[in-house]
Every structure is written in structure tokens, then in C-alpha cells.
Amino acid sequence: MFFELFKKECAQTGKSLIYWFYVLCLLLFFFTQMGNPGFDSQRKPVKGEEDTYGMVTSTDKDVIMEQTLGILGQNLYYDEWSTYPAGFVKYVSLSSREKEEIWNILGECTGLASEELREKIDTEMESDKQAEGYLDAYMQPLILEPSDTLSYDEFQEKMERICQILGPGSDFEKSSYEQGYPVPATYEEAMEEYNSFLYDDKITGGYARLFGDYMGIALGILPVFLVVTRELRDRRAGMEELIYTRTASSGKVVLSRWLSMNFMMILPVLLASFYTLFQCAAYARGLEVSVDYLAFMPVVLGWLLPEILIVSALGMFLTNLSSSPLAILVQGIWWFGDVFAGSNTGLATGDFGLHLVLRFNSTGGRQTFLDHFSQLTANRIFYFLLAMILLVLTVIVYREKRKGRWDFRGKIRSYRKRKSEA
């Protein structure tokens, strides 16, 4: 019975125009972002061409202090403060007293008097604006050297006070700044990164991460349109009452529909991953190195599939509960806020938190990714379990509507009909 329901639901999904709209949008996004990788991001370093070496993450204490203090000075200059509790952005407004206290802390860390410190920050920021433009100056980190007498322990104590002022989830938490900061790579470091890309990641590992990054953006919003349309289609076709009287249990009906839609939605993702895999294999043959032909499968099934599951589960629950396209609005707000927050925390830092859309926009950074892999795993398990909870709630709502309960729109229509007849 269940397998028959599953096959019928797959067939219905395949006949749906909105499904092919989903496939078209997904593949269009894929081809515009990764259709032609080019493989320029990982070229063999040439000695003497420092501009081509790229960046590496440094956890040197001096680098951590000067860049963290620079971020603090930059925030003071723009008077813009944001934190990321639970992975979501929160804008903080500070009082004049709190900002003055932060100025004093920064002065103690740099050993500069208040006026000298303010003048130094103003001069460097204005100079960057003139040289790079406002946006580039904003993105370019300010560097403030710590005082010669400032120890790392004292620096940490000062940052703890900053965290008390701003609240949880700021850039000044130990767990944040000790992840390190990007610095220009040396030739030796660039060669190490290149060899890791070829022989540890085997080329496909790096591009699988990039694939997950790009496809995750689209999959954070597109599935909800298919789910909502499929759920509302029966109401528009006047089939709701017939469906509610089926002999199959509510759990089987809901589960078969949910699984069939997720199965159909993951298929184009798999096809797109094969396309990139074959491109990587062709590139590897030219370099005479081997590739990992299974590198994309963990990304598709462990990174992207849980995202589809939670988006579809939320869409089914809200649509069954409200009998309206409310889920599109809710998912749209969540998706937009999450993508924006994820971009602000860095595109390849491994700071996954509780983000729906996981960002790691780099074919390199293998070690950084591995260092944060447990965080990614916890994130995807959390959303998988949340999807299961929403699925159970959907079954409950569906079952109650089968019994004629919770049909708020039907009751409203009946009330209006009785009122018009009176």
C-alpha cells in the first residue's frame, strides 16, 4: 500500500508544472554559478608571484590581537554593532557611556591616548576610502597593533568585557577570534594548500564543498513553492473531501507525499553533482592525478538533503494547518535573513552555527572545513530531527481534518452560506 502511494505521488509530482519550474530554476542557478568551474581558483603557485598565493588562516596570537582590535576600531568608526546569537544576526545599539567604555578599552590595548587613537583610526579609514572606495574600505580589515606591554591573557580579559557589553555571539568571543584570521600566504603555504587540494581533497572534495555552498542557497527557498502548490492543488481541484476519506492511514498519506516530493527534488541535485564531477575528472586527467568519485555524495545526502527535508516539512505543516500559502512567506523571510546572516559571518570560515544555508565558498580550506565538520554534522542532525517533528505535527493536523476538525476555512464558508441564506 505505502509503495503504491509513493509511486503515485512521484508520478503526480512529475506531472506538476511547478516541479519543472523548480528543476529549471535550480539548474539555471547551478549553471550560472558552477556550470564552468574554470579551475582558476587552484593554480600551482609560481615562486616570486606573491599576488597569486592567496590567503591562509593564521592563529598566531599577534595576528589575532591586531586584527581583533582592528575590527573593534572599525566598529567604533562606523558605530555599527552586530552579534550572531544562535547563528542569526542581531543588531545592537550602544549607549554613549558604553561606546566611551569601549574606546577606553581599545586605548588600553593599543597604548594610545584617546585623541591619538581616534585620529589614527579616522586617518586610516579615510585613506582606505579614497584608495579603495567606501565599500572596499568597509570590507578591508583595519589593523591596530597592540601595545608592547599587552599580554595575550590581558587581551582576552578586555575582550570578555566587550562581550559583556555587546551580548553573546560577537566577533570578540574567544571561540570566534581564536579561529584565526586570513593573512597573505607564503610560497610554502600556497604549495601546501595546492597539494592538499590535489592529493587530500583529490580535486573533487574542494568542488563538492563549493557545490554544497551554491546549491544550498537555492534549496533554502525553491522547495517550498513545490510543496505549497502540491498541498493546495487538491483544495483547488475540489479533491480534499475525497482524499480525507481514503482508506490509507493519515501517516501513510502524509509520509508518502513528503518522501516522494523530497525524492523528486533531490534528483536534479544529483544530476548537477554528476556534471561537476565529470568536469573535475577531466581536469584531473590533464594533471595525471586521481579523483574521489564519491566526494559529492556526502555533500548531496548529508549537507543538502537535510535542508530540503526541513524546508519541505515546514511547508507541508504550515500549508496543512492554514490551508493557505503562508509557508512561502515564512520560508522567504527565514531564507533571506539566514543567507544575509551567513554572508556576514564569512563565506568560508566554517562558522555554521544553526544556519539553514551553510556557506563554505571555497575550493580550498580543507583543514578549516575539517576543524568545523562536527559543527556541520550537529547542524544537519538538528534540522533532520526538526523536520521529523514537523512531519509528525503534519500527520496530526491531517488526521484531525480527516475527522472534520480544524477546518477553519470550511467553517467560515459554511457560516457565510448560512448567513446569506438567512
Language-model regions, residue ranges each:
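Hydrophobic alpha-helical transmembrane segments
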Residues: 20-23, 297-302, 328-331, 380-381
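Secretory targeting signals
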Residues: 25-86, 90, 161-222, 255-324
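Helix-loop-helix units of permease transmembrane domains in multi-pass membrane transporters
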Residues: 4-9, 14, 215, 228-267
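Hydrophobic cores of alpha-helical transmembrane segments in multi-pass inner/ER membrane proteins
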Residues: 224, 306-313, 383-394
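Terminal transmembrane helical anchor/hairpin motif
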Residues: 36-132, 192-199, 203, 326, ...
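Aromatic- and glycine-rich beta-strand/loop motifs that create alpha-glucan
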Residues: 1-26, 403-414
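Transport-system extracytoplasmic interface segments
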Residues: 104-208
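Cytoplasmic juxtamembrane interface segments
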Residues: 138-153, 231-243, 307-331
